[in-house]
Amino acid sequence: LGQLKDAPHDVYAIFSTQEEIGLVGARTTAFRVDPDIAISIDVTATGDLPKALPMAVELGKGPAIKVKDGGMIAHAMVRDMLVEAAKQAGVPYQMEILLGGTTDAAAMQLVRSGVPSGCLSIPCRFIHSPSEMVDEADIHNAVKLLLTALRTCE
């Protein structure tokens, strides 16, 4: 957050709870904050192991910009803003389509009259296990992408 002193607008970082049991924290917080846009930061599954479910997201190929998942379709403006930010920041990125599951953005897009919402995901193997695995470069690139998006969005 300290790197966002030059952002052209207010930025709220929300660390919510109860995502796995109904997106409760995201829903109530988005209602209270009433943001112009919302970007959820989450992890997503990968399909880069022989016994993994087929999925076009791989570890080490950059953060994933969500197109859709089992509970939401990313708002086109937010999705395109994240893609443009990745290009401006010079970071690799992947497009994510998750057939099941969802993220906090699904709840945030439904509050009040609707909040344009999207999601930036960190590719992760073995989600919801004691041995989750991410590529450190994907995390650093996600931070660069997000900072660029927040500094340049209008």
Would you name each region that the model predicts?
Residues 24-92:
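Metal-dependent peptidase/peptidase-like ectodomains
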Residues 4-8, 30-33, 57-59, 111-113:
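Solvent-exposed alpha-helices and their adjacent loops that cap or buttress functional pockets
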Residues 64-137, 143, 151-153:
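Active-site-adjacent substrate-binding region
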Residues 12-16, 38-42, 96:
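Short, conserved beta-strand edge motifs with alternating hydrophobic and charged residues
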Residues 15-21, 44-45, 124-126:
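Acidic, glycine-rich active-site loops and adjacent beta-strand->loop/helix elements
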Residues 1-12, 34-36, 88, 154:
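Secondary-structure boundary elements
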Residues 1-20, 142-147:
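Alpha-helical metal-binding/catalytic segments enriched in His/Glu/Asp
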